[in-house]
UniProtKB/Swiss-Prot annotation:
Keywords: Chaperone, Cytoplasm, Disulfide bond, Redox-active center, Zinc. Under oxidizing conditions two disulfide bonds are formed involving the reactive cysteines. Under reducing conditions zinc is bound to the reactive cysteines and the protein is inactive. GO terms for cellular component: cytoplasm. Its main location: cytoplasm. CDD domains: Hsp33 (cd00498). GO terms for biological process: protein refolding. It comes from Neisseria meningitidis serogroup B (strain ATCC BAA-335 / MC58). This is 33 kDa chaperonin. Redox regulated molecular chaperone. Protects both thermally unfolding and oxidatively damaged proteins from irreversible aggregation. Plays an important role in the bacterial defense system toward oxidative stress.
Length: 302
């Protein structure tokens, strides 16, 4: 089901410095973020990390050159199993998390403590046409922002500074980066990145791009481009669930229907529920897979 929450305040703003080869992006997500956190009862520490990852995904998707979706994931073996955020070229987003809901999680717990040992960062580019590309690296850094800076330094060899923040009201992010194949005086880059470091989490979550950029760079103001509006949209559908069931096979699916009466699949992102009863399953496979699971002779169905 395609669910959409539109908010004019949910924007990404690009900017560039004309007097130095540095570009940047600012993002602030308000209603979109509140729509996401209402889907589940997230512990505060996980909610904060998910908001930061969502803002990061929107920032990084600004570099998409073709139509498609950028997916950023953090995976672990601890109490937090996964964070995932998706940002598409049509400026739609969705995000969710999976964790051990029986575990105690303090409000101030770090991402590293939640993920445990063996955590990885996964970035996937899923083009509309063509083969997907995926990069997987061990988690490095104390939080999502530093993890992404390390990843981009390794993969793109570009100096980058990222600030991320998430509160109950909004998720925000700021990225400044050297332009590729351009020479930049080290002192100039240090000046820009030092100014970016002075931005507080409260300012990032609470201020729009105009106020953030003035607060940081009023002495050397960048050129600011037209804001791009984002919205929540989930790409789940009954057809995609049907494809998943077909991959599982008639024997397994028929067996589940015999045991449970039907198959129910809930979307992690938007909580849409898809129910397949005996008639649905048999029609999907084109034969009486439920009857076969009961020990009856195999036969096709119309």
């Amino acid at each position: 089901m395609n669910q959409t929450a539109i908010n004019r305040a949910d924007v990404r703003t690009r900017f560039i410095f004309d007097d130095m080869p540095v570009r940047g992006l600012h993002v602030r997500l308000e209603n979109v973020w509140q729509h996401i956190v209402k889907q589940k009862n997230y512990p505060a520490a996980i909610r904060r990390a998910l908001g930061e990852l969502l803002a990061a995904g929107v920032l990084l998707s600004g570099n998409l050159k073709n139509e498609g979706t950028l997916i950023v994931q953090v995976q672990g073996r601890g109490r937090l199993k996964m964070l995932v955020a998706e940002a598409a070229s049509d400026r739609t987003v969705r995000a969710t998390a999976r964790w051990d809901e029986t575990a105690e999680i303090a409000d101030d717990e770090s991402l590293g403590d939640l993920l445990g040992e063996g955590g990885v960062f996964v970035l996937t580019l899923q083009p509309k046409d063509g083969e997907p590309w995926q990069g997987v690296v061990p988690l490095e850094g104390g939080g999502i922002a530093q993890m992404l800076v390390n990843y981009m330094k390794r993969s793109e060899q570009l100096d980058t500074h990222i600030v991320l923040s998430a509160s109950d009201e909004a998720a925000g992010g700021l990225l400044v980066q050297r332009l590729p194949e351009e020479v930049l005086d080290e002192e100039a880059w240090e000046h820009v990145s030092t100014l970016a470091r002075t931005l507080t989490a409260e300012e990032l979550a609470g201020l729009d791009a105009q106020h953030v950029l003035y607060r940081l760079f009023h002495e050397t103001p960048p050129r600011v481009f037209e804001p791009e509006t984002f919205e929540f949209s989930c790409t789940c559908s009954r057809g995609k669930v049907s494809d998943m069931l077909l991959m599982l096979g008639g024997e397994e699916v028929g067996g589940v229907v015999v045991e449970q009466g039907s198959i129910e699949v809930d979307c992690d992102f938007c909580h849409s529920k898809y129910v397949f009863d005996e008639t649905d399953v048999n029609a999907l496979f084109g034969e009486d897979v439920v009857g076969v699971a009961k020990g009856l002779p195999r036969h096709t169905v119309q």
